Amino acid sequence: MEIDYYDYEKLLEKAYEELPENVKHHKSRFEVPGALVTIEGNKTIIENFKDIAEALNRDPQHLLKFLLREIATAGTLEGKRVVLQGRFTPYLIANKIKKYIKEYVICPVCGSPDTKIIKRDRFYFLKCEACGAETPIQHL
């Protein structure tokens, strides 16, 4: 009697059992709320900024620092919203948030949004909680 050591179904089941719990039951798509942008005079306000940062599982200050550098302006975090000096279109704000997600949230190895930023010595890494990959990222 021959034993098939490479039975596909058994190997697939074994691989599935070794996945972390947060990956096994992850059935929903990664969704980030759209930025609610209003312009008042010479100021641009992102009303749901803290909600966006929470959806990305990131510190709001980190996301704010990225946005301020990208659009070259000053701004402050006031409760759940951000006030930026200058007039910026919702399209520009949305594109900058997408760029942040690509660089600082999505794992470049497996594409999972389940990541965190870790610091080792003087370097920062994007650590994926799904596949375990650590990718160096630029410090803000």
From Swiss-Prot:
Name of this chain's protein: Translation initiation factor 2 subunit beta
Record flagged with keyword Protein biosynthesis: yes
Subunit structure comment from the entry: Heterotrimer composed of an alpha, a beta and a gamma chain.
InterPro entries xref list: IF2/IF5, TIF2_bsu_arc, Transl_init_fac_IF2/IF5_dom, Transl_init_fac_IF2/IF5_N, Transl_init_fac_IF2/IF5_Zn-bd
Keywords assigned by UniProt, alphabetized: Initiation factor, Protein biosynthesis
GO molecular function: translation initiation factor activity
Organism name: Pyrococcus abyssi (strain GE5 / Orsay)
Zinc-finger found in the keyword field: no
Biological function: eIF-2 functions in the early steps of protein synthesis by forming a ternary complex with GTP and initiator tRNA.
Family listed: Belongs to the eIF-2-beta/eIF-5 family.
